[in-house]
């Protein structure tokens, strides 16, 4: 009995063990299945949400990204990381959200693992000082220093100015010439506006007449509907009142050089000031260099107007200081290549208008205030007048900085203009054109793209043909007799160079695009006058108008380009459009010119630009101190 009972107990134990093991196996299988289901659900969610997010972002920043480049396993790993984590990134990471998923982006992150692509935007800063102190921006390279960095160079600059009797104007004085010391103002009366005299530095502002006299208001014209075909008044300030070169680029040149001098970076006893340009900036740089006791070198494209080279030959003694590079207006890359070669010699100090943020500062402080003065003047007689837009073509984009002030203080839209034959911003396009001084086939580093409101493209043919209308008896007679344009308005049209005509046409197109009326003013600038393009009109007369330019030709040009200025090739920008244009600049500045990615990316932040724009009074204090050390005049 005992033996039999033991057998029964043993059998039951075996059954229990088998059942228990089976239950364990079932539980394990269920757990595994549950894990698989969870994983599949997560994957499906990531794919659905991720695909939607990428489809949205793919409309932004796709300009010219390079899918053909490979960077090895690091880039492939970065691509995998992006796919797995794209939706886990902070929703404030705009730079990642606005750039398409592509091999090139993976390459960027592999190269720059600490870049701003995967960081939240930097907080706005009240001034540039804290930013430069952290080393997050190369202030030295881009001319944004606010302290003396080389005492010996500084002392030699002081000595040079003392020896040559040079006083430097402040930005505040150029913005408001009534603040220029009375003794300097009195002395200017005896000095020709085109003379190589240091006192002409105090004429580098908008308040001159054609003879160098001081005006209470910047000289300008208000273009009326009889000419423009739109009800909105278009206010045009004349840039050919600036001294020496008859163009406002002389202001940009002074703005770029003076901070380098008062911080001790530029030494007139050791350096040559090299001015890369498509024309007027090089002339302005040579003029400013001469007035400030420096040696200037002009680097410009060989196909610029004959008048530009004739001017340079008069001002430059050494022919080696005029360097011609291949191409025409849009061949700025060839200028950069030449400057890279020149920079190998430490005696050459490159003052690149496309990267010198002082160019932006000068126009924001001086041009912006002058144009504001014009708007306020006209609002006095029309209290309901609104400032609808500031319209200006982009060469270096310096002039567009004036729009920053007009936008922040008066709500004006900022509309950039380029040549239709080289529509870089509008269509990521390329090509050659003849609107000299603008449209250089890239996005300048100093262009605040993310604060821009619109882009307009204008054909160089329109500018060439209207240049004939504005500067021939037949054309002017047609405007007054057949179109009813006031004689006083027609008399000013000789103050419009090619890019000036471009600005006016873009303003007309902007007014039509926005549906503006008589109480909506647009403001722009005539950067230079027709006197710089006589040779271009000669070429037109010998070529396109070889059979003659009469009333019929004038009427055809006006019908097509003024009356026919429509809303084609106009884009008002949203965030996607701004980021598309901003991202395009990466290929010039980071890939070609070696700008650090963080330095490039920080320019998305309007806090950065606010800090840049607040540098003018800081530099003014340094200019006052510099003048005091020379002992030439009080300078205040």
Label the model's feature ranges:
Residues 65, 107, 111, 115-116, ...:
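Short, positively charged and aromatic/hydrophobic N-terminal segments
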Residues 50-51, 81, 99, 104-112:
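Polybasic, low-complexity intrinsically disordered segments
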Residues 128-636:
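PLP-dependent amino-acid enzyme catalytic core
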Residues 1-67, 71:
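Low-complexity, Ser/Pro/Gly/Ala/Val-rich intrinsically disordered tracts
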Residues 53, 58-60, 64-78, 82-90, ...:
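Residue-level detector of structural "landmarks"
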């Amino acid at each position: 009995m005992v033996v039999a009972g033991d057998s029964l107990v043993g059998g039951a134990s075996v059954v229990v063990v088998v059942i228990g093991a089976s239950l364990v196996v079932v539980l394990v299988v269920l757990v595994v299945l549950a894990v698989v289901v969870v994983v599949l659900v997560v994957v499906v969610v990531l794919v659905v949400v991720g695909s939607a997010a990428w489809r949205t972002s793919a409309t932004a920043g796709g300009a010219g990204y390079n899918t053909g480049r490979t960077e090895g396993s690091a880039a492939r790993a970065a691509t995998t990381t992006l796919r797995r984590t794209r939706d886990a990134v902070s929703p404030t990471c705009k730079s990642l959200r606005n750039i398409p998923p592509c091999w090139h982006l993976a390459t960027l992150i592999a190269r720059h693992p600490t870049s701003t692509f995967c960081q939240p935007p930097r907080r706005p800063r009240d001034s540039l000082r804290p930013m430069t102190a952290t080393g997050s921006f190369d202030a030295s390279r881009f001319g944004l220093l606010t302290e003396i960095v080389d005492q010996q160079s500084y002392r030699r600059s002081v000595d040079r100015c003392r020896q040559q009797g040079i006083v430097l104007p402040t930005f505040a004085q150029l913005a408001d010439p009534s603040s220029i010391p009375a003794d300097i103002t009195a002395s200017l009366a005896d000095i020709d506006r085109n003379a190589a005299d240091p006192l002409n530095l105090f004429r580098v502002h908008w308040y001159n007449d054609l003879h160098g006299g001081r005006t209470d208001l910047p000289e300008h014209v208000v273009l009326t509907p009889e000419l423009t075909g739109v009800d909105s008044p278009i206010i045009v300030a004349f840039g050919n009142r600036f001294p020496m070169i008859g163009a406002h680029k002389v202001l940009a040149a002074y703005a770029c050089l003076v901070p380098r001098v008062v911080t001790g970076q530029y030494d007139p006893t050791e350096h040559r000031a090299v001015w890369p340009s498509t024309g007027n900036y090089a002339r302005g740089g040579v003029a400013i260099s001469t007035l400030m006791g420096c040696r200037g070198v002009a680097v410009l494209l060989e196909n610029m107007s004959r008048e530009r080279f004739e001017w340079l030959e008069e001002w430059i003694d050494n022919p080696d200081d005029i360097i011609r590079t291949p191409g025409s207006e849009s061949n700025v890359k060839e200028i950069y290549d030449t400057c890279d070669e020149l920079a190998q010699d430490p005696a050459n100090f490159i003052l690149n208008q496309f990267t010198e943020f002082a160019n932006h500062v000068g126009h924001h402080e001086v041009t912006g205030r002058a144009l504001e003065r014009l708007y306020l003047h006209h609002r006095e007689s029309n209290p309901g007048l609104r400032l609808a837009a500031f319209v200006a073509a982009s060469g270096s984009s310096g002039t567009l900085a004036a729009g920053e002030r007009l936008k922040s203080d008066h709500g004006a839209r900022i509309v950039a203009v380029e040549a239709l034959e080289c529509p870089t911003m509008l269509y990521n396009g390329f090509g050659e054109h003849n609107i000299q001084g603008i449209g250089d086939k890239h996005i300048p580093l100093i262009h605040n793209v993310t604060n821009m409101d619109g882009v307009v493209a204008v054909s160089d043919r329109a500018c060439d043909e209207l240049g004939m209308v504005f500067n021939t008896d037949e054309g002017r007679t047609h405007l007054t007799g057949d179109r009813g344009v006031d004689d006083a308005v027609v008399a000013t049209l000789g103050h419009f160079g090619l890019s000036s005509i471009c600005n006016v046409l873009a303003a007309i197109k902007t007014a039509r695009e926005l549906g503006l009326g008589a109480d909506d003013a647009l403001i722009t600038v005539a950067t230079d006058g027709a006197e710089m393009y006589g040779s271009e009109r000669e070429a037109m007369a010998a070529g396109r108008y070889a059979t003659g330019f009469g009333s019929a030709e004038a009427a055809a040009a006006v019908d097509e380009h003024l009356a026919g200025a429509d809303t084609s090739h106009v884009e008002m920008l949203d965030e996607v459009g701004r980021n598309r244009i901003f991202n395009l600049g990466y290929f010039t500045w980071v890939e070609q010119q070696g700008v650090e990615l963080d330095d490039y990316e920080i320019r998305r932040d309007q806090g950065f630009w606010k800090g840049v724009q607040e540098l003018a009074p800081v530099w003014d204090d340094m200019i006052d101190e510099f003048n005091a050390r020379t002992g030439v005049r009080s300078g205040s």
